[in-house]
Amino acid sequence: MSTSAQVPGGPAAQMKRRNNAQRQEAKASQRPTSTRSVGAGGSSSTMLKLYTDESQGLKVDPVVVMVLSLGFIFSVVALHILAKVSTKLLG
């Protein structure tokens, strides 16, 4: 047996732990801290960005969105009525 007692792992293990801690700190500092920079609820590079102050995408007025959605609802109701009338007349 040797007369000097060595610490398990020695200086090499201590250097590895220190390097790993430094790498983890560097990785943590590179991560975005806000959910907006990560992409809240999904990807931040979506194909169509609607009405955010930061985006360079399409800016749509809320009135336009309301008119288009009401027009869509009206067209669906009209198609249902047309289908009912046509089945009663033809069949």
Curated annotation (Swiss-Prot):
Its main location: endoplasmic reticulum. Residues 30-45 have a biased composition (Polar residues). Residues 1-45 are annotated as: Disordered. Residues 1-62 are cytoplasmic. GO terms for cellular component: membrane; Sec61 translocon complex. It is found in: Endoplasmic reticulum membrane. GO terms for biological process: post-translational protein targeting to membrane, translocation; SRP-dependent cotranslational protein targeting to membrane, translocation. Pfam families: Sec61_beta. Keywords: Endoplasmic reticulum, Membrane, Protein transport, Translocation, Transmembrane, Transmembrane helix, Transport. It is a single-pass membrane protein. GO terms for molecular function: guanyl-nucleotide exchange factor activity. InterPro entries: Sec61-beta/Sbh, SecG/Sec61-beta/Sbh. The chain crosses the membrane at residues 63-83. Signal peptide: none annotated. Belongs to the SEC61-beta family. PANTHER family: SEC61 SUBUNIT BETA. Necessary for protein translocation in the endoplasmic reticulum. Heterotrimeric complex composed of SEC61, SEB1 and SSS1. This is Protein transport protein Sec61 subunit beta. It comes from Yarrowia lipolytica (strain CLIB 122 / E 150) (Yeast).
